[in-house]
Design a protein with these regions (language model features):
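N-terminal secretory targeting modules
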Residues: 1-89, 142
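Serine-esterase "nucleophile elbow" of acetyl-processing enzymes
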Residues: 70-140
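Structural motif
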Residues: 87-88, 147-149
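Loop/turn elements at helix/coil->beta-strand transitions in domains of secreted/extracellular proteins
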Residues: 117, 144-148
């Protein structure tokens, strides 16, 4: 178990208030949303791949049953945060977030199912370890954390 109190993490910048997610095209997300595409998993990229590989079984599966990115009110690919029940925090990049994957196929979802508890996916695609630390520092006092995975 690690202590995530303010004295234990030396970070370059502190998050004072969590801001809504701003995606790469400049749009700002507010409230819970379900997206068919996420910046690194674009419709254009899918069409190009499907045109070049029309018999690819994975692409055919995704064409019949498209991936949806269900985001909570903070822009995380996670249900709304239930702060009363203990849960597992998952930090990381697009692999943890699940770009190009059904939620149930992500490593974070599988580990959470195995260990039990609420699912707090704080993954941030395209970001680094310092972003993960800032997010952990901000959310550590707001969530009932059972385990932290990175």
């Amino acid at each position: 178990m690690i202590n995530v109190g303010k004295k234990d993490l030396c970070l370059p910048r502190e998050i004072k208030e969590y801001q809504p997610l701003q995606i790469s095209n400049g749009d700002v997300m507010t409230g819970k949303q379900t997206l068919d595409w996420y910046p690194m998993d674009s419709e254009q990229r899918f069409r190009e791949n499907f045109t070049n590989h029309p018999t690819n079984k994975s692409l055919l599966t995704y064409k019949k049953n498209p991936i949806q990115y269900k985001l909570n009110e903070y822009g995380f690919r996670s249900d709304s945060f239930d702060t009363e029940k203990p849960g597992n925090v998952f930090l990381g990049c697009s692999h943890t977030f699940g770009i190009g994957n059904y939620m149930e196929n992500t490593w974070s979802h599988k580990v959470n199912k195995k260990v039990g508890g609420k699912f707090f996916n704080l993954a941030s695609p395209g970001k680094g370890i310092m972003t993960s630390l800032r997010l952990l520092r901000y959310w550590s006092s707001k969530l009932n954390i059972k385990n932290i995975f990175h």
